[in-house]
């Protein structure tokens, strides 16, 4: 770690644009970031203060050198600040005054796999925050007919490829173009675009072979400078940052990795942060930035100006929430605390008839809730933090069993909560991939519906329709024994039957399926039944259609129950039969 120094306010009008990288798992986000940074991230770092801040600056000199063979004249930005926490959920957690922290984004797509579930989630998030982005079409080295060329420039690389390779590349690019068009987005290869305000740039790259990265830097810098000048104008105000990771260092206490996106922060400043108990103030004990010499080297500084990735050591052991703001207080305490409170509000539509959601940060909470809502899954309550015993107890009391589930995104289940879950019927789904959690939640709901449907069938008469099979008449009375086809619903021993005119048609005494006695039978099936209290060819006849008699007292409940359409249609047929005699049948509470 180097000795203390001070970074002065930038003389330039523009600050560094903040760039976030998103994409589907295994499409090459981390490898691309490693190439851009010019260094690989260490798998494990020694104790003490972790020697890495989750944001990296690529200064203008490095960009100019990488793009010197391209038309890089007139660059005014001081560099690019890349967020080293890739992914659409991390993007959601990075806020700046209600909008996205990132000024621009890179969406990484495996050119051979195309658009995948997490790609779609990333597109949705980018559209939601109205964040401009480019596409890095990665893994062009895996396309057939690839020829290795010693150059980092895509424009040089493509000129030295066989026509077969060029054709294969274009086919894959236009597959992405066509898919993006389905999401309302126009796109094309970057060197074929005349108006970048209307068309998303696709830059073919190979992170593995280090091809196309200069073009990515060139396009990012050009777009930011040309179209985002007002957003990246430096403002000399009290420091505003977004916390992207909270570290509890044994040797140093609480360390906050953050992105300073406006203003200045200094050692000794009073800063406001949000905790699980609300906004509080604390003192800046020390500040660190990356040295730029290596990914594991930090420099301690007295002052930092935007935009920069910083590590802030604070003087108090606070339960700070990741994704929340950090604001320097300069005699404006009330205003800052209000700003912290407003920025920390969860923007999720809630519904009493919904489920519980927990996540590690506000943005994650909104991201998972957004995807659940898209699938018609309503949210009753959403909160930051691990799953607790209190959460389980609250969910257990919900009236609707379909809502007795807790979704946990990037959180743990506390030991006391695990014990409570085991003794309850509360479902818990946890994970760190949104689309997988959504899929698992949908499966859980469908399975719970089936369980509830079966319980209801066992507890009360189920609307059912049967037909007597004239070729299977075994006994005419005491009891009638006939073969029947269960056409809809479920019949049970003890069910009363009615005819299509509403007249009583006996009571099911027993059911046999392949010589085995059963208590109930679901449709569709052909079984033998014994029917008490009727005589064949008097009250019932071969080829008759009969219905299970439904008590009027359960009609309203059955109409609200989650049952198959065929069963609900049969219930309506029974109601129609009953109302021939009583027009108001089934309307009582």
Swiss-Prot record:
One of its GO terms (molecular function) is GTPase activity. Disulfide bonds: none annotated. Residues 48-52 are annotated as: G2. Residues 14-231 form the tr-type G domain. Gene3D superfamilies: P-loop containing nucleotide triphosphate hydrolases, Translation factors, Translation initiation factor IF- 2, domain 3. Residues 138-141 are annotated as: G4. Residues 84-87 are annotated as: G3. One of its GO terms (cellular component) is cytoplasm. Residues 206-208 are annotated as: G5. Keywords: GTP-binding, Initiation factor, Nucleotide-binding, Protein biosynthesis. GTP binds at residues 23-30, 84-88, 138-141. Residues 23-30 are annotated as: G1. The keyword Transmembrane does not apply. Belongs to the TRAFAC class translation factor GTPase superfamily. Classic translation factor GTPase family. IF-2 subfamily. Function in general translation initiation by promoting the binding of the formylmethionine-tRNA to ribosomes. Seems to function along with eIF-2. This is Probable translation initiation factor IF-2. It comes from Thermoplasma volcanium (strain ATCC 51530 / DSM 4299 / JCM 9571 / NBRC 15438 / GSS1). The gene is infB.
